[in-house]
Swiss-Prot record:
Chain positions with Phosphothreonine modification: T637, T667
UniProt biased composition (Acidic residues): 631-641
Its biological purpose: E3-ubiquitin ligase; acts as a negative regulator of cell proliferation through mechanisms involving G2/M arrest and cell death. Required for MHC class I ubiquitination in cells expressing the cytomegalovirus protein US2 before dislocation from the endoplasmic reticulum (ER). Affects SREBP processing by hindering the SREBP-SCAP complex translocation from the ER to the Golgi, thereby reducing SREBF2 target gene expression. Involved in the sterol-accelerated degradation of HMGCR. This is achieved through binding to INSIG1 and/or INSIG2 at the ER membrane.
Zinc finger (RING-type): 547-586
Phosphoserine PTM positions: S636
EC number of the protein: 2.3.2.27
Transmembrane segments: 51-71, 85-105, 125-145, 154-174, 178-198, 293-313, 323-343, 356-376, 390-410, 420-440, 470-490
Name of this protein: E3 ubiquitin-protein ligase RNF139
Gene name in the database record: Rnf139
GO molecular function, one term: zinc ion binding
Enzymatic reactions: S-ubiquitinyl-[E2 ubiquitin-conjugating enzyme]-L-cysteine + [acceptor protein]-L-lysine = [E2 ubiquitin-conjugating enzyme]-L-cysteine + N(6)-ubiquitinyl-[acceptor protein]-L-lysine
Pathway: Protein modification; protein ubiquitination
Processing and modification events after translation: Autoubiquitinated. Ubiquitination is induced by sterol and leads to ist degradation via the ubiquitin-proteasome pathway.
Membrane topology: Multi-pass membrane protein
Species: Mus musculus (Mouse)
Length: 668
């Protein structure tokens, strides 16, 4: 078989995209029906039977719409084929009834300028239009139901019989009988075809039910919902639903404004334009489905914003592409927490603007998490290209300036409250994060500029990052208190309580736990290094070797392990953050109570250095006893790589839950 060429692949991909777009478009009406049912009202003064009937019909509509929404592509197309055939049949019956019984084609004669009655020209033209219309309905009907050729011709003729009776000027009662018989035949045929297809519908429904039950038993409810979410392209459906709804409302509002102002100009004033925008925003989140649709639109915007920033700063990390997921989840949780869709229109607009400010700060925090690893990698790799450093520094500068501007604008227009305090705290926290990142970046760049080993660099970096983490922890505690005050005295809810618990776990408890773990790892490493003898002075020249970790010569001092291998104290300390074995022979790095008399001890190259004492332990301890350069237990100030990766997520910690927890407990 010949391989499929690129043009054929492009055609196939285009066809798949067309079918996918059509599938999404066919699922959107289900959301409109569900949204209309949820937003409808019933009169409580009616009888119980009427109220019960309305509730039953609404539940039935929701169930049927939900089933159609999750149908497979093939079943969805068949459902719309049969539905379209039914609508064509009903429309054809209505047209025949109205044309045959309610239109007098010969009542209107064209009159010339001299008052002479001419032949009826309107009647034949309407006959032809009706014949073409009914032929279109008939052909579409038999095509959608896939009726056999001979039988299909009879059905088309049955649809045209009332028009033929109208043309032949049959009496009115005969035309009524003809229309009735034609309608009954068409209805009977439709019911017969649907009854034949009922077997297929039963087996299809049973197959879907067994498949769903099988997937639920094997994979669980979560994976089943995720598979359905992706299979039906639910985010795309929500976007199309929300955008078409907003577009329709915008068209109606523009038409009403033009009619009210009695102007034919296409443009409207700025005041009217602002009123239209406010009304569209208010109506764009008036129900749970519309909030989901707005979340889907925000997801698309955030996704492409994240991709653009990643391309601009030159990052290729896959974990940084989660902005399109974190932003909509955070927005939806904020909307649920504040009861956005249930507020009055004026309050809804204010609440939405506040939620968007919180969402903006969350997005900026996430962007900082995308930028910080790139900034650190550029500084540590000693890349001197201006084109590589400028985009990251420019984004970092924007991340510092935008929170300042946002805080200034909000403080200029609003009085101090819990919501403004929370937004300001998040902005200040982001500015501190940027300062910490730029400070560490500067330290690494200074280290790369000089060729001499900077032994205290590790301590300085840890000191800067630890200071930033401590300040973040303080902000987390303050925000928890602010959220507790809001919940107790302003607007408490179950969702807010859950978010506060998540905030306390992710942004307070885990941060303390990880920071303490990092500190203890460093303290243990320092203890182990301090327990090792130090070589300095003339003994370094006798070693005549390099550090096996950094491959630099020993200029000031070196530490010797129990297995007689030499390393820089700083290099060995970094190694001990990861594991407590020797980098060369993988023996435990510790000092035993009894010194082993091992004359076979070797240095990094496996041989004893010239003029070296075969048993150097006592001499080395004597030299180390007078040394005043002992490493203190708490002077180490750089976090290890694992802890740093945990803090490089921008909004910190795991996924959207931590982001929502950090920004959700202070939304008032």
């Amino acid at each position: 078989m010949a391989a499929v060429g690129p043009p054929q692949q492009q055609v196939r991909m285009a066809q798949q995209q067309v079918w996918a777009a059509l599938e999404v478009a066919l699922r959107v009406p289900c959301l409109y029906i569900i949204d209309a049912i949820f937003n409808s009202y019933y009169d409580s003064s009616q009888s119980r039977f009427c109220i019960g009937l309305q509730i039953f019909l609404r539940l039935l509509g929701i169930v049927v719409s939900s089933i159609v929404l999750i149908l497979s592509q093939r079943s969805l197309f068949k459902f719309y084929m049969y539905s379209s055939a039914f609508l064509l049949a009903a429309t054809s019956v209505l047209v025949n009834y109205y044309a045959a019984l309610h239109i007098d084609f010969y009542g209107a004669y064209n009159t010339s300028a001299f008052g002479i009655e001419l032949l009826p020209r309107k009647g034949p033209s309407l006959w032809m239009a009706l014949i073409v219309l009914q032929l279109t309905f008939g052909i579409g009907y038999v095509t959608l139901l896939q009726i056999q050729s001979i039988y299909s011709q009879l059905m088309i003729l049955n649809i045209l019989v009332p028009i033929i009776g109208l043309i032949t000027e049959l009496p009115l009662h005969i035309r009524e009988t003809v229309v009735l018989m034609s309608s009954l035949i068409l209805i009977f045929n439709t019911v017969l075809v649907l009854a034949v297809k009922l077997k297929w519908f039963y087996y299809s429904t049973r197959y879907v039910y067994l498949l769903v039950r099988h997937m639920y038993r094997i994979y669980g409810l979560q994976l089943l919902m995720e598979d359905t979410w992706k299979r039906i392209r639910f985010p795309d459906i929500l976007r199309v639903f929300w955008l078409t709804r907003i577009t329709t409302q915008a068209t109606v509002l523009m038409y009403i404004l033009r009619m009210a102002n009695e102007t034919e100009s296409f443009f409207i004033s700025w005041d009217d334009f602002w009123d239209v925008i406010c009304n569209l925003i208010i109506s764009g989140c008036d129900s749970t489905l519309t909030v989901l649709g707005m979340s889907a639109v925000i997801s698309s915007i955030a996704h492409y914003l994240g991709l653009g920033i990643l391309a601009f700063i030159g990052s290729t990390e896959e974990d940084d592409r989660r902005l399109g997921f974190v932003a909509p989840v955070l927005f939806f949780i904020l909307a649920l927490q504040t009861g956005l869709s249930g507020l009055r229109p004026e309050e809804r607009l204010i609440r939405l603007s506040r939620n968007m400010c919180l969402l903006l700060t969350a997005v900026l925090h996430f962007i900082h998490g995308m930028t910080d690893p790139v900034l650190m990698s550029l500084s540590a790799s000693h890349v001197s290209s201006f084109h590589r450093h400028f985009p990251v520094l420019f984004v970092s500068a924007c991340l510092f300036i935008l929170p300042v501007l946002l805080s200034y604008v909000l403080w200029h227009h609003y009085a101090l409250n819990t919501w403004l305090f929370a937004v300001t705290a998040f902005c200040v926290e982001l500015c501190l994060k940027v300062i910490v990142s730029l400070t560490v970046y500067t330290l690494f760049m200074i280290d790369g500029y000089y060729n001499v080993l900077w032994e205290k660099l590790d301590d300085y970096v840890y000191f800067v990052r630890s200071t930033g983490n401590i300040i973040e922890f303080i902000f987390g505690v303050v925000m928890f208190g602010n959220g507790a005050y809001t919940m107790m005295f302003e607007s408490g809810s179950k969702i807010r309580a859950c978010m506060m618990c998540l905030h306390a776990y992710f942004n307070i408890y885990l941060q303390v736990k990880n920071g303490w773990k990092t500190f203890m790892n460093r303290r243990t490493a320092v203890k182990k290094i301090n327990s090792l003898p130090e070589i300095k002075g003339s003994h370094l020249q006798e070693i005549d070797d390099v550090c096996a970790i950094c491959y630099h010569e020993f200029t000031t001092s070196a530490r010797i392990t129990p297995c007689n291998h030499y390393f820089h104290a700083l290099c060995l300390r970094k190694w001990l953050y990861i594991q407590d074995t020797c980098p060369m022979c993988h023996q435990k790095v510790y000092i035993e109570d009894e010194i082993k008399d091992n004359s076979n001890a070797s240095n990094n190259n496996g041989f004893i250095a010239p003029n070296e004492n075969p048993n150097p332990e006592e001499a080395l301890r004597e030299d180390a006893a007078g040394s005043d350069r002992e490493l203190n237990e708490d002077d180490s100030t750089d976090c290890d790589d694992d802890a740093q990766r945990e803090r490089n997520g921008g909004i910190q910690h795991t996924g959207a839950a931590a982001a929502a927890a950090e920004f959700n407990d202070d939304t008032d």
